[in-house]
Amino acid sequence: YCIVVANCNKPHNLVESKYNVRRHEVEVALKKIQEVKKINALAELTPEEFNEVKYLLSGVVAKRAEHVVTECARVTEAVAALKRGDIAELGRLLNESHYSLRDLYEVTGKELDMLSALARKEAGCLGSRMIGAGFGGCTISIVKKSAVEGFIRHVDKAYFDAIGYRASFYETSIEDGVTVTKL
């Protein structure tokens, strides 16, 4: 398997986006929960612990906090899946992450949602999610190496047909980790 990065090529500006609003909403949630729990960050809560204090939050603030807490749990699960060599589980977690970013954190947009959905429909793709701050940018997809060429061709065409402009694709590979090369 390899990672395929797809740039939706939607122009975006984080300063003018709702990115800072999301950060503020998470800070509001943290302060409210700190009234009853001694935590420094939402990441310290398990999803079960969050459910016990969710009543303190309302509306979008609750959704934003739920995303942060469940995303942290997914990261922990992803590390365990990687240690087991369970790439299919990692793909499932990527999909869940994208759904949470779309439905709870609301930072995806039609272009990123389209790229991720098209990727998930392709044979050989185990999972796909947006990366970065959102409101434009890129997705990553876990794709079987033998399927990459067809994956890019199919997703590119379907994305162009749906959105009206092309995405850019980059096939990446995971090497042996960080190395030092003496020049």
Put a short name on every predicted segment.
Residues 136-142:
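Short beta-strand->loop micro-motif that forms the acidic, two-metal-ion catalytic signature
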